[in-house]
UniProtKB/Swiss-Prot annotation:
Family, per entry: Belongs to the MISP family.
Assigned keywords, A-Z: Actin-binding, Cell cycle, Cell division, Cell junction, Coiled coil, Cytoplasm, Cytoskeleton, Mitosis, Phosphoprotein
Quaternary assembly: Associates with F-actin. Interacts with DCTN1; this interaction regulates DCTN1 distribution at the cell cortex. Interacts with PTK2/FAK and MAPRE1.
Name of protein: Mitotic interactor and substrate of PLK1
Species of origin: Mus musculus
Length: 648
């Protein structure tokens, strides 16, 4: 009954009924058997399925069903029953002599309280599956041996709202909505059930079967039902309900776990997405492809004392930033590979060849581990690495140091038996035999690299760098001297010893974009040069034309050969420090009539992106500067005039 309006809420005779407490014969545990009537929304003419299990069980007492919550043993009921079917007879048979009623009362109240707590705690997770129950009439007759009987009145507390019945009714309605009955069945199939009770009887084989604290009956003699029709379960977990009561073990639940509405929405969305992907011919979205491997800092034992730690290890971004960067490069690679699969040779599918697809993208050429870190690993297939390869470092290594081979992992391995030059030469010959065009730039750079590199002498642990190696010849990645219109398409070429020859061609759009960027940058440099020469002819000496074209050639050709990396080139064509990742600054040999060193300091005196040597910028800066307005007293104070003559 509602506490405010005093209307009976669950006075429906078809609502949930609870039987009296039953005492097991062999033990002193109490067993509460609960029978539930048909739910409020179900029709009268529904077909009901009754369990015949109770007729065969000799150890349960005969009871009638009433809708009580509290049990008074050995007393008369202080109230009358409020049920509509008041002609119902209430009988109760005790098992053994009830001498100590007080202890039993206390035990029964504890048991009832424990049952309520258990039912709420287990039901809250939504993982326990119980069979939905039904009964048309009030009495569930259960055969049992005749014993000495004591009749007792059972009280219905009309002041309390039956929250348990309300919860069960709500759950049954929700189940009826979410799990519709298959259309082949005319009436609803109902299963007998004894919801939350306590079953601590040691004879688990004869008693009702336990499923996570629930006593459930598992047989339905009217109809054999398979639950595969109305549940989305895998065939390995589908459960058949058969007429053998011993077939259901205690571990199995008689029904698959219910699916919450949110889970159902997620599942439907995933199925929809999979169908759409199938229609569009896309592969299924695999979450494991997004798992990438991020290299951690090398241990102190891996680092040798002769080399400084790589620049990336000094100020390394956080793990999340690294993961995003690696994932982005991975997506770009996959996208490029998918686009290149039609008509051109593409990089092979990684999952079939290499079990670790994340390493190639995250390790780069400046992560210098010990040379034997990955010497045992097989050389991987080619990958684009956006760093300067080791060949760019070769002229600066002394002739006594061993030449390290560069693999696409970005990890240096020890030189193998075949010398680097031989492998490069064979790779280049194979590449020229392939039907694709190879740009002349890679050929020239290769030949120049082969001029620079000398056969490895005896390996020494001390890296000897000669002074002559610091005088850097201008980087000879020159584009061939052909007009812009007839330029051959840029190609990326990776030479990996023992790997397949793969040439990845740039797409036309990125090629055009790069050309446009180059022309814009070139025009900007020319304009800045003209401006400097116009305003400061005495500081900036005119540049020899051949050097300028040579410098621009080398810079654009390094872009053309795909070697774009973390090195910066200053804007002056005379004085070009190339910042490599080793922390040293390699400088191009300046011509004899080079600019005075004041130019470098002038370059470094930039503030807020404004070049102080640019007079146009300076004029704009001066025109937009706001004068600071001071009043007369402040100006006098700053001029150290603290007293006026008038006051004297």
């Amino acid at each position: 009954m509602d506490r405010v309006t005093r209307y009976p809420i669950f006075s429906n005779p078809r609502s949930a009924r609870v039987t009296s407490l039953v005492l097991d014969e062999d033990t002193s545990y109490t067993v509460e058997l609960v029978g539930v009537g048909p739910e409020a929304g179900w029709s009268q003419g529904d077909l009901q399925a009754w369990s015949t299990e109770y007729q065969t069980r000799p150890d349960v007492k005969r009871t009638n069903v009433s809708s009580n919550r509290r049990v008074f043993l050995g007393q008369q009921s202080p109230r009358s029953l409020y049920l509509e079917d008041e002609d119902e007879e209430i009988k109760s048979y005790h098992l053994d002599d009830s001498s100590d009623t007080l202890c039993r009362q206390r035990r029964e109240l504890e048991a009832e309280r424990w049952a309520v707590i258990q039912s709420q705690a287990v039901r809250k997770g939504g993982t326990v599956a119980t069979l939905q129950a039904a009964s048309d009439h009030g009495d569930l007759r259960i055969a049992r041996q005749p014993q000495s009987t004591v009749t007792e009145e059972i009280l219905v507390d009309t002041e309390q709202i039956d929250f348990l019945a309300a919860r069960q009714q709500f759950l049954s309605l929700e189940k009826a909505n979410t799990n519709p009955v298959p259309c082949g069945l005319t009436a609803r199939e109902t299963f007998p059930r004894t919801p939350p009770g306590i079953n601590q009887a040691p004879k688990a084989s004869t008693g009702p079967h336990l499923a996570n604290g629930y006593t459930t009956a598992v047989t339905s003699p009217m109809k054999e039902v398979t639950l595969e029709k109305s549940f989305h379960v895998s065939p390995a977990r589908s459960i058949h309900i058969v007429n053998d009561p011993g077939s259901q073990t205690q571990a199995e639940s008689p029904e698959t776990p219910k699916e919450t509405p949110i889970e159902r929405e997620i599942r439907l969305a995933q199925e929809r997405e999979a169908e759409l992907r199938e229609q569009r011919g896309l592969g299924r979205a695999a979450g494991h492809q997004e798992l990438v491997q991020i290299p951690s800092r090398p241990l102190l034992s891996k680092m040798s004392l002769t080399e400084t730690p790589p620049r990336r290890d000094r100020g390394r971004p956080s793990l999340y930033v690294q993961r995003d960067m690696v994932q982005e490069t991975q997506r770009e690679e996959d996208h490029r590979r998918e686009g290149l699969q039609v008509g051109r040779a593409s990089t092979p599918d990684w999952p079939s060849q290499d079990p670790q697809p994340g390493l190639q993208r995250s390790l780069s050429s400046d992560c210098i581990l010990s040379p034997d870190a990955r010497a045992t690993d097989p050389a991987p297939e080619a990958r684009k690495v956006n760093r300067i390869p080791l060949d760019a470092y070769q002229p600066y290594l002394g002739p006594g140091t061993p030449k390290l081979e560069f693999s696409a992992f970005g990890v240096y391995s020890k030189p193998s038996g075949v010398s680097t030059e031989d492998t490069k030469a064979t790779v280049f010959q194979k590449a020229t035999e392939s039907p694709r065009h190879v740009s002349e730039s890679s050929g020239r750079s290769l030949s120049s690299k082969q001029e620079w590199s000398k056969p490895p002498g005896k390996a020494t642990n001390v890296g000897v760098v000669r002074l002559g190696n610091f005088h850097l010849r201008p980087l000879r990645f020159k584009v061939p001297d052909v007009p812009q219109g007839t330029e051959t398409p840029h190609t990326w070429g990776w030479e990996v010893a023992g790997g397949p020859i793969l040439r990845l061609q740039k797409s036309q759009s990125s090629d055009l974009l790069e050309r446009e960027m180059e022309s814009v940058l070139r025009r900007e440099r020319e304009v800045a040069e003209e401006r400097r020469n116009a305003f400061f002819p005495e500081v900036f000496s005119p540049v020899p034309a051949e050097d300028e074209s040579h410098e621009q050639d080398s810079r654009s050709s390094s872009r053309a050969s795909g070697i774009t990396g973390s090195y910066s080139v200053s804007e002056s064509p005379l004085f070009t420090p190339v910042h490599l990742n080793s922390g040293l600054v390699w400088k191009v040999e300046a011509p004899e009539d080079s600019a005075p060193p004041g130019q470098k300091t002038r370059k470094e005196m930039w503030y807020a992106g404004i070049n102080p040597s640019d007079s146009v910028n300076s004029e704009v800066l001066g025109a937009t500067r706001v004068k600071r307005h001071k009043n007369l007293l402040a100006e006098r104070w700053e001029a150290h005039i603290y007293a006026s003559e008038d006051e004297n």
